[in-house]
Amino acid sequence: APKGVSRLDYRHNHFCPVLDQSPRPDALLYRGDEVPLDMNRLCTLRDSALKLPSSSVYIMDSGMAAILGATLDARVRACGPAIVLDVATSHTVAACFEGDELCSFVEYHTKDIRTERMDSLLKELADGQIQHQQILAEGGHGAYTRRALGFDSIEIILSTGPRRSMLAGSSHPIQLGAPLGDNMMTGTVGLLEAIRRREGWSEIPYD
């Protein structure tokens, strides 16, 4: 990141214009030759992957892959406005979707999650009341809001990720997701779906 700009703000500034123009997680999928040169971690992953015997390489932010994967759970696909979460080992991402449209998301450090704060975050997220700088000040990774769905319109809240049991005491009716029948495949499913959309392959049944 340039001097005076935090790494998290710099990453946020990469994501926002892309999502403003194409509000779907798969918009943040990069073919090997498309990875921005200033995204050091993605470039390092790309360079490692290029050593494998493959005709093409795709790279995607793991949080974006996970929330896309969570939306492919059959129960989410059968509903209207939804909140999906991926509670991973290091980071937790919560996102609001209407169909394939990513309306908002927030990213937090999993170790800092407290049930009461996560409950309020989910409502604030859907109501469009979360600000990026506010989340950074709390020690989180940031937030993005394109439009507010309204918490009262949410039809399902679904969680994936290896540490989702941390949300067991939530006051919200959080369902446990398993795209492709396996909670631990969430990110893989999201990456596969992003590549499928890019390549124009036939739809894949993930339930």
Regions found by a protein language model. Give the residues of each.
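A charged amphipathic helix-loop-strand protein-protein interaction module that recurs
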Residues: S120-L121, L125-I130
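A broad structural signal for short, well-ordered beta-strand segments within beta-sheet-rich domains
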Residues: S54, H91, E101-C103, I154
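Catalytic or ion-translocation cores adjacent to nucleophile or general acid/base/metal-coordination motifs
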Residues: A95-L122
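Gly/Thr-rich phosphate-binding beta-strand-loop-beta motif of the actin/hexokinase/Hsp70
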Residues: G80-G99
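Nucleotide/phosphate-binding catalytic cleft detector across ATP-hydrolyzing
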Residues: A1-A82, Y108-T115, Q133-D207
